């Protein structure tokens, strides 16, 4: 039975003299390249190419239907189908479910017999369009992804297309779906993107912080028992010269002892937005009794999970560019096309890493073992620590097994960060819940490098070198080189 998937996402679409040649496609709906997101009560009007012209208001709608049917969204008003929780299964809302971590998680939870709802404004696809980037792996539209999943498994995933910064949209979505758990991936997740220029720095903070506050209010107003599973980042901690604990540290000062939130030393406007999120969530747990798990995730690599490997239309995105690509993914693509691995600076930057298959496993464990009402708990979500030099050496060794001649070069570091430092982060809580990690030494070839070789003809080598400088960020909007 077809599901009508609601949106009250409104967009102000900029007029264009050559509209037909400058369109962005989501499913069957076309959007001009240049537009401004509009939220109902937001003081911010962000993204790129804002204009003073009178702009047309368009209501965006989305549908999912079985593969052998076609459904046309009615014009005029939004509507929801509330199936009710008659199955007794837990209902999980995945905000940002069209993204890298969100899509893999949504499929994994659906397979595990959760009732899943994806909420997404699809803006991540727009970022690629604006910056001239593309996923290494071809990715289908979210509508086709969901239809294919239903065709293969018989399982339905609800879809609500809209902006969680628009509280009216979010409220209607909450009232419609009635989630037991909210998994919140729905944030601008790139540090380099947040450092391109002022407008993108502002967008990152506005989108991430206001969106999370809206989620907290929605839980308070419509679903007080709901468990928030929020994706944070290990980057909140920075690189202190002491061990990194899981969220909290017990200290003795002037003869008195207390357990306090671990100090935060964020290194970009993106990482700072995550710090603000953590503070806001901790406050509302204390003040309102919300239950929340903050997953401070390390750097994720890989593309394949058991579910995304079922069909090409379920394939996840694989970012390799200098804006959205993570270090290991970038190195594997560079090796595949014969480009030297680009190590930033001295290469001693050490971080926690995990396979995308472990991301979905961690989220499932957090859902199955929820926080108590009023509890704010923090899990450090990674499985192994590596320096950038270590990663380059691993990729070089793996490349040799495939007959690749892999070289490494040092390039000026575009970031402001320590290039040699102490790093020892604790990560025991998820292991205690039953996490069984996929280690990089066992999975580098099958999870990353083979995909890079398979799709190497899709690589745009102009996107390999760093293009965003932490020190050169300014007020003037920047267009990355094509």
From Swiss-Prot:
Q: Which GO terms describe its molecular function?
A: enzyme binding; FMN-binding domain binding; UDPsulfoquinovose synthase activity
The positions annotated as site (Important for catalytic activity) read 274
- EC no. given is 3.13.1.1
Q: Which residues are recorded as binding substrate?
A: 189, 233, 270, 297, 327-330, 342-344, 415-417
The stretch annotated as transit peptide is: 1-61
Gene Ontology biological process terms from the UniProt entry: glycolipid biosynthetic process; sulfolipid biosynthetic process
Q: Which CDD domains match?
A: SQD1_like_SDR_e (cd05255)
**Annotated NAD(+) binding sites:** 100-101, 120-124, 163-164, 189, 207, 270, 274, 300
Active site (UniProt): 233, 270 (proton acceptor), 274
Q: Where does the UniProt entry say this protein principally localizes? A: plastid
Give the matching Pfam families: Epimerase (PF01370)
Enzymatic reactions: sulfite + UDP-alpha-D-glucose + H(+) = UDP-alpha-D-6-sulfoquinovose + H2O
Q: Which domain of life is it from?
A: Eukaryota
Compartments, record wording: Plastid, Chloroplast stroma
Query: Which cofactors does this protein require?
Result: NAD(+)
Modifications after synthesis and translation = The N-terminus is blocked.
> Quaternary state and partners of this protein?
Homodimer. Interacts with FdGOGAT (via FMN-binding domain).
Task performed by this protein: Involved in the biosynthesis of sulfolipids found in thylakoid membranes. Converts UDP-glucose and sulfite to the sulfolipid head group precursor UDP-sulfoquinovose. The sulfite is delivered to the reaction center by the FMN-binding domain of FdGOGAT.
Return the similarity comment. Answer: Belongs to the NAD(P)-dependent epimerase/dehydratase family.
Report the protein name in the record.
UDP-sulfoquinovose synthase, chloroplastic
Naturally occurring in which organism (per UniProt): Spinacia oleracea
């Amino acid at each position: 039975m077809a599901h009508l998937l609601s949106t009250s996402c409104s967009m102000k679409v900029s007029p264009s003299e050559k509209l037909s040649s400058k369109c962005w496609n989501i499913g069957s709906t076309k959007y001009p390249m240049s537009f401004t997101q509009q939220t109902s009560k937001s003081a911010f009007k962000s993204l790129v190419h804002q204009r003073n012209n009178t702009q047309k208001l368009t209501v965006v709608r989305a549908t999912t239907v079985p593969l052998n049917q076609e459904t046309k969204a009615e014009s005029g008003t939004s509507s929801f189908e509330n199936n009710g929780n008659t199955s007794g299964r837990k209902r999980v809302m995945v905000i940002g479910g069209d993204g890298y971590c969100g899509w893999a998680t949504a499929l994994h939870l659906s397979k595990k017999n959760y009732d899943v709802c994806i909420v997404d404004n699809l803006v991540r696809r727009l970022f690629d369009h604006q910056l001239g980037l593309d996923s290494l792996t071809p990715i289908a539209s979210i509508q086709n992804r969901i239809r294919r999943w239903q065709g293969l498994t018989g399982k339905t995933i609800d879809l609500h297309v809209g902006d969680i910064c628009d509280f009216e949209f979010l409220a209607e979505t909450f009232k419609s779906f009635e989630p037991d758990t909210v998994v919140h991936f729905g944030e601008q997740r790139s540090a380099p993107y947040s450092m391109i220029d002022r407008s993108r720095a502002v967008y990152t903070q506005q989108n991430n912080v206001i969106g999370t506050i809206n989620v907290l209010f929605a839980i308070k107003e419509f679903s007080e028992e709901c468990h928030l599973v929020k994706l944070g980042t290990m980057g909140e901690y920075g690189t202190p010269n002491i061990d990194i604990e899981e969220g909290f540290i017990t200290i003795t000062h002037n003869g008195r002892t207390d357990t306090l939130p671990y100090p935060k030393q964020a290194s970009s406007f993106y990482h700072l937005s995550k710090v603000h999120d953590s503070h806001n969530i901790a406050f509302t747990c204390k003040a309102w009794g919300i239950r929340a798990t903050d997953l401070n995730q390390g750097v994720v690599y890989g593309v394949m999970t058991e579910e995304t490997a079922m069909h090409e239309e379920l394939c996840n995105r694989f970012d390799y560019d200098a804006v959205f690509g993570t270090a290991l993914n970038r190195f594997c693509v560079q090796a595949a096309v014969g480009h030297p691995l680009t190590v930033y600076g001295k290469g001693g930057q050490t971080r926690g890493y995990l396979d995308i298959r472990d991301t979905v496993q961690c989220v499932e464990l957090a859902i199955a073992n929820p926080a108590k009402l009023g509890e704010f708990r923090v899990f450090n979500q990674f499985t192994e620590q590596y320096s950038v030099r270590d990663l380059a050496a691993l990729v070089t060794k793996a490349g040799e097994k495939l007959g690749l001649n892999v070289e490494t070069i040092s390039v000026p570091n575009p970031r402001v960060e320590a290039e040699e430092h102490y790093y020892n982060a604790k990560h025991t809580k998820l292991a205690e819940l039953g996490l069984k990690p996929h280690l990089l030494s066992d999975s580098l070839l099958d999870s990353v490098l083979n995909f890079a070789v398979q799709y190497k003809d899709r690589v745009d080598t102009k996107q390999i070198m760093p293009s965003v400088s932490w020190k050169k960020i300014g007020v003037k909007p920047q267009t990355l080189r094509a």
